[in-house]
């Protein structure tokens, strides 16, 4: 199993609207083959910071998701939020192997 984390920080626009979009996109991803779960996290002290945590059976399942129309649809829904700006230096995507 692998875990993918994706972290961003909103610098303009409505972070609450982004939180709603994130909640709505979960159904686009968690039903795909190989997806074991999705969590959307919002930092307690810095509410403009978000982290998406996805769990996949293996790297092939994650790669297939990135090529799936659901990947583009989920990211497009976020990009379409009026006035939303994401700090490009805050975007961090990391992969982890699950050891236990």
Residues of each region from the PLM?
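Short, flexible segments with low predicted structural confidence
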Residues: 1-2, 17, 33-35
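Glycine-rich beta-strand-turn "strand-cap" elements at beta-sheet edges
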Residues: 2, 39-48, 76-100
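Short acidic/polar alpha-helix capping motifs at helix-coil junctions
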Residues: 2-4, 15, 26
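Short, well-ordered beta-strand segments in beta-rich or mixed alpha/beta enzyme
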Residues: 2-8, 39-66
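Short, surface-exposed ligand-recognition loops at beta-strand->loop->(often short) alpha-helix junctions
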Residues: 9-18
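A generic structural signal for ordered secondary structure
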Residues: 10, 29-32, 95
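Short, solvent-exposed amphipathic helices
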Residues: 21-24
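An amphipathic, aromatic/His-enriched active-site/gating alpha helix that lines ligand/cofactor pockets
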Residues: 27-36, 55-90
